[in-house]
Amino acid sequence: MKTILSKEEQASSSLFSPIILLAFFGFALVGLSGGASGVLLPSLSFYYHVDNAVLGLLFLVSSLGYFLMAFTSGLLVERLGLRGFLILGAVLFLIGDAGFGLKPPFVLVLLSRLSLGLGVGVVETGLNIYVSRLTRSDALLNYLHAFYGVGALVGPVVASTILFLNWGWNSVYFILGGLCLPMLLGFILLFKKETRALPSKHDEQKGKGTMLGDTLKIGVVWLAALFLLFYVGIEVSLGNWTYTFLLNDRHQNALLSGWIVSGYWFGLTMGRFVLQRTAERLKISNTQLIYGCLMSVIIALLMISLIHLPVVAALGFCLIGFSLGPMYPLTVALTPRLVPERIAASAIGFLVSVSIIGLALFPWLAGVLAQSAGTWTLLPYTIALTIVAFGFWWSVFHRKRERTSSKIV
């Protein structure tokens, strides 16, 4: 049930209102942090004298933090209000960046990464909650997630440039921490009316204690969740290990490798901005679009595997990002059509929670494979993940056809 908004809240739905611009900035900062982290992995490995398998622990602890916030966000928002919740997230984000910047022992680096994961989980969840309550929420949420891609596009360029200038890998985290400060100030000043607990949604759920149980009984929800599990594994594994792959396996220089990774995130961003609209004009259903995107990912990965040229790698990773871009938001958008209306919100929450496991598990496995067999394994590994994801998406579509004769669009 949507909250009835005041005139002031309706005005905040404007694309250029300060609070929406702050939300875009927050998501861009999350993307900037994620995009930069992959470029910094070799520097962390050298500085702390740890291998790729140990570095994979960074993904596990970060995702643990995100996962904890995904399951406790309702209670925290109810207790703190949305403003307090977002302020908490910005502070945790800042603490995590400061921890990395100080170059502490590796055990404390893991704690800093946990703080970053908690902070990212709060900022993403809180801003999604706010924007989803506004008019034009569908369009605004699409733009919101696209700005993550904008940040992820800039992140590798910033990080690789700083490394190229020999400013030290920790300088990247001081920059990120500095950017957290205006976000924190914005949450304090612009969310003053969001100190109350969120209405209706939690109260409704209290009266329907079996909502999550009912959600878990629906097979198509599990299939969609498993699709997103593997999708996130593909996206994050490539986003974080492509730079190391280009350095170690293709012997590219650091600056070019950073630009190629940025091209991957640029493709992801552009895919979210344009692919769905283009498909709609061409009367291609969202289901068919995802099939086509998955095939494009496999073709691009094979192309990079077989042709060892920098230009092919650059174009291939950009195409992969472009093809991956719309899959996550389209799956979330289709979910209410797959389940009864009463449990749609619960189903979406379950999908997001399961996808976080993919964010932790698959990049870690990529690191283990890179350490044991070499970074060349990244491409066949992601091809295998994409094939499995294709199978789960086929199952989602055909389970839906069994449930209803209506077409998924």
Sequence positions of predicted segments:
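Conserved MFS/SLC helix-loop-helix module at the cytosolic interface between two early adjacent transmembrane helices
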Residues: L68-V107
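Extracytoplasmic gate region of multi-pass secondary transporters
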Residues: S37-G38, G219-S262, T269-M270
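Helix-breaking motifs and short loop linkers at transmembrane-helix boundaries and internal kinks
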Residues: H49, G81, L102-V107, H251, ...
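A late C-terminal transmembrane helix in Major Facilitator Superfamily
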Residues: L338-T377, Y381-T382
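Helix-loop-helix hairpin linking two adjacent transmembrane segments in secondary transporters
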Residues: S137, Y143-T195
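C-terminal transmembrane helical hairpin of 12-TM major facilitator-type secondary transporters
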Residues: S285-T331
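Helix-to-loop junctions at the C-terminal end of transmembrane segments
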Residues: M69-G81, R272-S285, A370
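Cytoplasmic helix-loop-helix junction between adjacent transmembrane helices
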Residues: S112-G149
